[in-house]
From Swiss-Prot:
Belongs to the bacterial ribosomal protein bS6 family. HAMAP family: Ribosomal_bS6. It comes from Borreliella afzelii (strain PKo). Gene3D superfamilies: 3.30.70.60. GO terms for biological process: translation. GO terms for molecular function: rRNA binding; structural constituent of ribosome. This is Small ribosomal subunit protein bS6. One of its GO terms (cellular component) is ribonucleoprotein complex. The keyword RNA-binding applies.
Length: 139
């Protein structure tokens, strides 16, 4: 089953090693059947503690889709890359948002706010009923 993954990589800070290792990671992804590869460079930062005698590192986030069976083989390939200090691969969960619930909740909050304003000011502001608001939202 194809899943969407998000991986964070920490490379050595040297420019040449970083570029070479990043290309090696991308080639490995393609080799193991990854699709929709999106790469984002986060930046170079000082590390809180030395990792493999390195005080600085470059962070890269790569999103990709891959079969779950190929992931273990890909991880074993990552362990062989010397200038890769750390990595973390997470399954990216995509959830659908129920907009009807949001509209209802927003209407209730709107109605509650108007009721509070009516109590404070003493004047009456008309609030549409839920069926009237549904008609308005459909238009």
């Amino acid at each position: 089953m194809i899943k969407r993954y998000e991986a964070c990589f920490l490379f050595k800070s040297e420019e040449i090693e970083y570029k070479g290792s990043l290309e090696e990671v991308k080639k490995s992804l393609e080799l193991y059947g990854a699709t929709d590869i999106i790469s984002n460079f986060i930046g170079e930062r000082a590390l809180e503690y030395p990792i493999k005698k390195q005080a600085r590192g470059r962070y890269e986030i790569i999103e990709f889709s891959m079969e779950g069976n190929n992931l273990k083989e890909f991880e074993s390939k990552l362990k062989l890359i010397k200038s890769l200090l750390r990595y973390m691969i997470l399954v990216k969960i995509v959830r659908k948002i129920n907009t009807k619930k949001i509209k209802r909740r927003n209407f209730r909050e709107f109605k509650d706010n108007i009721d509070k304003e009516n109590l404070k000011s003493g004047s009456k502001i008309e609030v549409p009923t839920s069926s009237e608001s549904a008609d308005i939202q459909e238009k």
